[in-house]
Amino acid sequence: MNLSPREKDKLLVSMAAMVARRRLERGVKLNHPEAIALISDFIVEGARDGRTVAELMQAGAEVITREQCMDGIAEMIHDIQVEATFPDGTKLVTVHQPIR
């Protein structure tokens, strides 16, 4: 299987998000990379499902809560920007204050 660098990045984020989901199910608080991966994966998959940029900007801030993250993680993440493929092309989705 020959994957482009972009496809490898997407696969890595998806795998990290899967690990984060498992940890949340066990009650383990997320660290910085896990929180970023989980929100990023939500945005990429939402774009594939046909959701709009505006919907994903709003919903991306509701994926995880402050209580689901280690102390200080919410303050470390001011914005998350994800390049996602929508039915009409690739767009940049920005989520401001993604962990509330």
Curated annotation (Swiss-Prot):
GO biological process: urea catabolic process
Gene Ontology molecular-function annotations: nickel cation binding; urease activity
Subcellular location: Cytoplasm
CDD domains: Urease_gamma (cd00390)
Keywords: Cytoplasm, Hydrolase
Domain of life: Bacteria
Catalytic activity from the UniProt record: urea + 2 H2O + H(+) = hydrogencarbonate + 2 NH4(+)
Pathway note: Nitrogen metabolism; urea degradation; CO(2) and NH(3) from urea (urease route): step 1/1
Keyword Transferase: no
EC numbers for this chain: 3.5.1.5
GO cellular component, as recorded: cytoplasm
Pfam families in alphabetical order: Urease_gamma
Annotated coiled-coil segments of the chain: none
Assembly and oligomerization: Heterotrimer of UreA (gamma), UreB (beta) and UreC (alpha) subunits. Three heterotrimers associate to form the active enzyme.
Family of this protein: Belongs to the urease gamma subunit family.
Name of this protein: Urease subunit gamma
Gene behind the chain: ureA
